[in-house]
């Protein structure tokens, strides 16, 4: 990925848009589309060609594959989010009340880490992502966005918040 693509795949708060199912250029959407194409017609082909030779177990597996493929299609089709870097500041981010996209635009930075005021005391950072915001932007400031992306591109979106809430 180019640096610009990496910047667009990470929110100014440091949360990985890339690993969110809603992100239009994200890994989940890309992989779901690829799997969907591989499975497209597979169910119908097996049911129609082998319908007289299928056991009850085979039919159950085929039905689950069909449901799985419908879910895949739902993951990659339809409207998606362009990520907070493309957000002009008129709305929040993943969390509607988030003021980080607007603040980063006002300060002319891609990431809070790039701002002279970071870490600031503004109340635009939602409580549930404060630790992620702080730690992620410190990492970006010290090591750069490319290393942050490489380190986190396969980690589930909001997993840190989920793990903290379930400890």
Show which residues each predicted segment covers:
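Cysteine-centered metal-binding/redox modules
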Residues: 1-167
């Amino acid at each position: 990925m180019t640096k610009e693509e990496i910047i667009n795949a990470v929110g100014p708060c440091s949360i990985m848009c890339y690993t969110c199912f809603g992100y239009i250029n994200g890994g989940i959407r890309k992989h779901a589309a690829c799997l969907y194409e591989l499975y497209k017609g597979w169910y119908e082909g097996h049911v129609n060609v082998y319908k007289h030779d299928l056991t009850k177990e085979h039919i159950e597996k085929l039905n689950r594959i069909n449901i799985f493929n419908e879910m895949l299609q739902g993951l990659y089709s339809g409207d998606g989010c362009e990520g907070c870097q493309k957000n002009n500041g008129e709305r929040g981010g993943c969390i509607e009340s988030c003021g980080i996209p607007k603040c980063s635009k006002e300060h002319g930075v891609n990431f809070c880490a790039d701002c002279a005021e970071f870490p600031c005391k503004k109340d635009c950072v939602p409580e549930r992502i404060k630790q992620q915001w702080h730690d992620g932007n410190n990492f970006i400031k010290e090591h750069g966005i490319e290393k942050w992306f490489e380190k986190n591109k396969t980690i589930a979106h909001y997993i840190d918040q989920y793990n903290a809430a379930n400890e």
